């Protein structure tokens, strides 16, 4: 296994060395970033030379909160889902299950996490990590199932749902369940679509 803070993929030349050149051109999907930017992206006046100031981050979080229908105090902007997953995993630790097959980092974010089939994930204690829709197969967990999993979390257990691809159907999001007492952490992405 790679060190948790040093590897995220995206090395197309390494993949070609390992698996052979195959039929070119290769399509690199490792970042999840749409290579076809929205029209007129160059016309946006953004300062790419420095990090955003606290007020700008608070503004981003407020806009995201409005978009997702949650209170701004429940939003924390991070520089990508990958780092967010790893940071949260380092903070909560403990026993955990992650849905397999699934996104590789879900299995690495909490050292003691164990792979579990999607239909059996709620049969065990500990925190639960899954994506909805799932990455890589697109499997969708029914809202009722996720709400049941959330209701069964308590103590130090969390439901961690990676909603990086939830923009395909906003009704999939558990954002309406976010609250001060919910043992729920959602991960959203601005870079997928």
What are these regions (language model features)?
Residues 1-56, 63-66:
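N-terminal "arm"/small-domain region of PLP-dependent enzymes with the aminotransferase-like
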Residues 32-38, 81, 132-136, 166, ...:
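Short glycine-rich anion-binding loops that position phosphate/pyrophosphate groups of nucleotides
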């Amino acid at each position: 296994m790679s060190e948790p803070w040093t590897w995220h993929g995206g090395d197309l030349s390494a993949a070609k060395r390992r698996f052979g050149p195959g039929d070119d051109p290769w399509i690199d999907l490792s970042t999840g970033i749409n290579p076809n930017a929205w029209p007129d992206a160059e016309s946006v006046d953004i300062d790419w030379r420095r990090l955003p100031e606290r007020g700008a981050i608070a503004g981003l979080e407020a806009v995201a909160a409005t978009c997702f229908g949650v209170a701004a105090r429940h939003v924390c902007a991070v520089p990508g889902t990958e780092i967010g997953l790893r940071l949260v995993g380092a903070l909560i630790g403990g026993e955990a299950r992650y849905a397999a097959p699934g996104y590789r980092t879900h299995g690495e974010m909490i050292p003691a996490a164990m792979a579990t089939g999607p239909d059996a994930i709620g049969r065990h204690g500990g925190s639960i990590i899954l994506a909805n829709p799932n990455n890589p197969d697109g499997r969708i967990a029914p809202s009722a199932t996720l709400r049941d999993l959330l209701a069964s979390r308590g103590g130090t257990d969390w439901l961690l749902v990676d909603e990086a691809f939830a923009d395909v159907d906003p009704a999939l999001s558990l954002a309406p369940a976010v609250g001060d007492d919910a043992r729920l952490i959602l991960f959203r992405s601005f870079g997928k679509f």
